[in-house]
């Protein structure tokens, strides 16, 4: 049990650090499980999804005042209504494709080779976009055009391939359609809420018969650790990308992906 608690802490830290960075939390969790013998097995695959709720609650805590104002204006404030519609429009493509093809994606694409190649390709794309001479027109994540929300949602679907990064795909799309770096990052946080809650509920329902009391204790530990870690990371991340952009994260992806391919080629 103690060794499982230690695993939960390590994986909770990995989830909290990587969930909102454009580096792919799913990819990192899969690689950590493979190369360090942590988190392998059916329960740990479910665990990886369930602890994402801790990271999502970190966003709700950090943006509580803004999200509460939007919720209060749901029936009276046109701006709040427009943003809620925008988030739902952005969420819809992933919901449809996830429901239709999620099991096939997990069966055929959830392996370390796919993760490593996706990390490298995604890093190259992120590096390219970060160096473009873009002229941002949208500086508030709650006021994007509705069609722009839809395009971002379509881009997020690519992140169903492990290693691509949900936040990375949505950030790149938002920047290409005119968002500044901070607004792009913030909308990726907001879009994560329905996306990850949906994945959490779906996996919890599928695994409900297999989760024991001991399992729930382990999940609770990972949940709390991911929550605390995500709060620290998000607050730091926004300030960093506003000043320095995404190059650090692009190279992070390339280095991790390359090292992963080398390890796999050596038979690890």
Curated annotation (Swiss-Prot):
Keyword Methyltransferase: no
Primary subcellular site in the record, as a coarse category: membrane
InterPro entries membership: UppP
Gene: uppP
Enzyme class, first EC level, given as a word: hydrolase
Transmembrane parts of this sequence: 9-29, 47-67, 83-103, 107-127, 144-164, 184-204, 218-238, 246-266
Sequence similarity: Belongs to the UppP family.
Name the UniProt record assigns to this protein: Undecaprenyl-diphosphatase
Stated role: Catalyzes the dephosphorylation of undecaprenyl diphosphate (UPP). Confers resistance to bacitracin.
GO annotation (BP), single: peptidoglycan biosynthetic process
A single Gene Ontology CC term: plasma membrane
